[in-house]
């Protein structure tokens, strides 16, 4: 494993431990080169309450690896989380920089009604 990936995973592990202590529902983001994924995970970490990604049928048609696609995923996960009764979440960026697609997803989720 590369040093860059090890560092990202270490940051993610530390953040998740802190969120586990606080017992909050978290919005977890994973970013690959072609897609972006978002899940709202219960406080105990055992159940996914809502999810969205660029692999969803309605988002798959357009470009999937850009900022516009990340915004659509953020809006969709916010809608699904609100339908599941979740409005307050902790943002888990999985060690990725809060920049570009990750930031676009977070901003769209906030506009969709989720509170971080």
Curated annotation (Swiss-Prot):
Pfam families membership: Ribosomal_L18p
GO cellular component assignments: cytosolic large ribosomal subunit
Keyword field: Ribonucleoprotein, Ribosomal protein, RNA-binding, rRNA-binding
Xref: HAMAP family: Ribosomal_uL18_B
Recorded family membership: Belongs to the universal ribosomal protein uL18 family.
Quaternary structure and partners: Part of the 50S ribosomal subunit; part of the 5S rRNA/L5/L18/L25 subcomplex. Contacts the 5S and 23S rRNAs.
Entry function: This is one of the proteins that bind and probably mediate the attachment of the 5S RNA into the large ribosomal subunit, where it forms part of the central protuberance.
Name recorded for this polypeptide: Large ribosomal subunit protein uL18
Organism: Pseudomonas aeruginosa (strain ATCC 15692 / DSM 22644 / CIP 104116 / JCM 14847 / LMG 12228 / 1C / PRS 101 / PAO1)
């Amino acid at each position: 494993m590369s040093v860059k990936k090890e560092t990202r995973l270490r940051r993610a592990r530390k953040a998740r431990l802190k969120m586990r202590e606080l017992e909050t529902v978290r919005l977890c983001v994973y970013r690959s080169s072609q897609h972006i994924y978002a899940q709202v995970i219960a406080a105990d970490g055992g159940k996914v309450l809502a999810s969205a990604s660029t692999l969803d049928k309605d988002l798959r048609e357009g470009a999937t690896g850009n900022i516009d696609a990340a915004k659509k995923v953020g809006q969709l996960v916010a809608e699904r989380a609100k339908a599941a009764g979740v409005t307050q979440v902790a943002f888990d960026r999985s060690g990725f920089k809060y920049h570009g697609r990750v930031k676009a997803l977070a901003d769209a989720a906030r506009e969709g009604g989720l509170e971080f």
